[in-house]
């Protein structure tokens, strides 16, 4: 079925969803990891569900989710508040119970007709997550915008936009899981939320004990042609990495790295190299890639309660001059990525918190020679079940300037990874060419395998 030439989405006026019961009226402080200048933006997430009459006959997803949101906000009541700015631009949460913004909508289209249009970079995102005037700010605005759009097939799309200073992906998932549990009839979340942002406050006295290349200024040898300040020239596409692409990339890696190399590491090294080539960066220019590393779990020794829903990550940066990155085999970039990720531990995270205090919350560089990547393939968005089963797709809706989110995607019958990328139109064409070249099977392998290159570009 073809997608209609003009998509008709009817939206009711937005409403504020408040906690279902009275909640504490108080002021809460964010941690230094939350209160970073670089997190003062909103993250869009999209979740798409098929109709499931056997599970939810005659139940309205808008009504179910609206009520579950209100009940979940009793436990996550700071999300119903507003951010205020104190001395030195320090953010605090005014827990005033004003509520989150909720929009009910319907569209004359089926999920099947939408096809790949629901995947990052989701060209129809503005239809399914309308930017109501006054909803996009950081200070004094709703911390969460949710739009539920019912489709003619009986399925629906839940799209949301979250103020990143409040939660990271793991924290948002805790909140969404609580909503989903209540939508399915639970009286309380199975994991109770924990605020306790003081666990990641700066130390007294603060002390920077690690190198933090992600916050360092670099000497700019460029002509500024790849700066991200001119948004009118930027385009978004997504690229698919399946079994064939990963097999070709692994053949380019020296034996001593293969056994310890993750799929995320390898894709990141590949993107970093191809993007640097595509941007035609001055050979002397320092280029960086940062990997967002979750501090939760035993691996990094950061002791946080199970229900902690604040930001708990760092993004250590790998650094290289453009020339060796572009001229060396892929193993060069891979080794740098692995070494940067290995620096992450509790001391690194606490050093970041202290740096925020001592250096006045510096932001990462916004030049095109910097890339930030986040692995959302195991974030758990695909497990969120409001009563209609698991979503056919769930995750970040698009790339954000310098930030690319890796998401799980099934291409036909194969599980792979979809990576949205944001670049200028000319650089995007070169990037796609470089990516096709580096993932192209040698001719002798093609003859044996008879499979064509499947790097996909989704407009």
Swiss-Prot record:
<dbReference type="GO" id="GO:0006066">
    <property type="term" value="P:alcohol metabolic process"/>
</dbReference>
<dbReference type="InterPro" id="IPR050898">
    <property type="entry name" value="Plant_acyltransferase"/>
</dbReference>
<dbReference type="GO" id="GO:0016746">
    <property type="term" value="F:acyltransferase activity"/>
</dbReference>
<keyword id="KW-0808">Transferase</keyword>
<feature type="active site" description="Proton acceptor">
    <location>
        <position position="385"/>
    </location>
</feature>
<dbReference type="GO" id="GO:0009836">
    <property type="term" value="P:fruit ripening, climacteric"/>
</dbReference>
<comment type="similarity">
    <text>Belongs to the plant acyltransferase family.</text>
</comment>
<protein>
    <recommendedName>
        <fullName>Alcohol acyl transferase 1 allele GSd</fullName>
        <ecNumber>2.3.1.-</ecNumber>
    </recommendedName>
</protein>
<dbReference type="Pfam" id="PF02458">
    <property type="entry name" value="Transferase"/>
</dbReference>
<comment type="function">
    <text>Involved in the biosynthesis of volatile esters which confer ripe apple fruit flavor. Alcohol acyl transferase that can use a wide range of alcohols as substrate to produce esters.</text>
</comment>
<dbReference type="InterPro" id="IPR023213">
    <property type="entry name" value="CAT-like_dom_sf"/>
</dbReference>
<feature type="active site" description="Proton acceptor">
    <location>
        <position position="164"/>
    </location>
</feature>
């Amino acid at each position: 079925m073809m997608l209609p030439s003009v998509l008709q989405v009817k939206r009711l006026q937005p409403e504020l969803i408040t906690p279902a019961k009275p909640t504490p009226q108080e002021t809460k402080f964010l941690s230094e990891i939350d209160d970073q200048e670089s997190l003062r933006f909103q993250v869009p997430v999209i979740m798409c569900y098929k109709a499931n009459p056997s599970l939810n006959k005659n139940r309205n997803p808008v009504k179910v989710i609206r009520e579950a949101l209100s009940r979940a906000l009793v436990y996550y009541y700071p999300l119903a508040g507003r951010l205020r700015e104190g001395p030195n631009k320090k953010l605090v949460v005014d827990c005033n119970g004003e509520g989150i913004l909720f929009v009910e909508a319907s569209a004359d289209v089926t999920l099947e007709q939408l096809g790949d249009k629901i995947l990052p970079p989701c060209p129809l995102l503005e239809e399914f997550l309308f930017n109501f005037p006054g909803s996009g700010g950081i200070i004094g605005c709703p911390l969460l915008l949710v739009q539920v759009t019912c489709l003619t097939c009986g399925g629906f799309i839940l799209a949301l936009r979250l103020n990143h200073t409040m939660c990271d992906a793991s924290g948002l998932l805790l909140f969404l899981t609580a909503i989903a549990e209540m939508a399915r009839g639970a009286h309380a979340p199975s994991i109770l939320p924990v605020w306790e942002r003081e666990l990641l406050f700066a130390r007294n006295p603060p002390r920077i004990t690690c190198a933090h290349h992600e916050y360092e200024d670099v000497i700019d040898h460029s002509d500024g042609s790849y700066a991200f300040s001119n948004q009118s020239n930027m385009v978004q596409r997504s690229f698919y990495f399946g079994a064939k692409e990963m097999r070709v990339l692994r053949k380019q890696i020296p034996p001593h790295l293969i056994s310890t190399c993750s799929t995320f590491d390898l894709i990141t090294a590949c993107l970093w190299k191809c993007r640097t080539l595509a941007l035609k960066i001055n050979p002397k220019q320092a280029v960086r890639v940062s990997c967002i590393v979750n501090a939760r779990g035993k691996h990094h020794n950061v002791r946080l309660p199970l229900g902690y829903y604040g930001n708990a990550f760092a993004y250590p940066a790998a650094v290289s001059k453009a020339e060796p990155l572009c001229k060396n085999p892929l193993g060069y970039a891979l080794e740098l990525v692995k070494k940067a990720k290995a620096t992450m531990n509790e001391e690194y995270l606490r050093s970041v918190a202290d740096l925020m205090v001592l250096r006045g919350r510096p932001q990462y560089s916004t030049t095109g020679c910097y890339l930030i990547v986040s692995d959302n393939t195991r974030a758990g968005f695909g497990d969120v079940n409001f009563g209609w089963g698991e979503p056919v797709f769930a995750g970040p809706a698009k790339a954000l300037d310098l930030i690319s989110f890796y998401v799980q995607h099934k291409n036909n019958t194969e599980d792979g990874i979809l990576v949205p990328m944001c670049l200028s139109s000319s650089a995007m064409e070169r990037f796609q060419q470089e990516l096709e070249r580096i993932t192209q099977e040698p001719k002798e392998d093609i003859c044996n395998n008879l499979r064509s290159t499947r790097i996909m570009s989704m407009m």
